[in-house]
């Protein structure tokens, strides 16, 4: 567990360093695009699961 705490501490330090530099604007734009993309994918998969399409249909049998 301490391993993950150290990993996330390093990631947060890197993110903090980038947040106080000019890289933050570009990273924020990319993050918005990726968030929208994965939000759309999540909605599609939820609808497909509700309709019983694909793997969800096989598991229901």
From Swiss-Prot:
Pfam families named in the record: DUF1328
Subcellular location: Cell membrane
Keywords assigned by UniProt, alphabetized: Cell membrane, Membrane, Transmembrane, Transmembrane helix
The UniProt record lists the keyword Cell membrane: yes
InterPro entries in the cross-refs: DUF1328
Coiled-coil intervals: none
Primary location class: membrane
Topology in membrane: Multi-pass membrane protein
GO cellular component: plasma membrane
Record bears the keyword Plastid: no
TM regions (residue ranges): 5-25, 33-53
Family membership noted in the UniProt record: Belongs to the UPF0391 family.
UniProt-listed HAMAP family: UPF0391 (MF_01361)
Protein name stated in the entry: UPF0391 membrane protein Pnap_0032
């Amino acid at each position: 567990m301490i391993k993950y705490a150290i990993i996330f501490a390093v990631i947060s330090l890197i993110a903090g360093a980038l947040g106080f530099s000019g890289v933050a604007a570009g990273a924020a734009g990319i993050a918005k695009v990726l968030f929208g993309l994965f939000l759309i994918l999540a909605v599609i998969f939820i609808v497909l699961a509700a309709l019983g399409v694909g793997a969800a249909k096989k598991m229901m049998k």
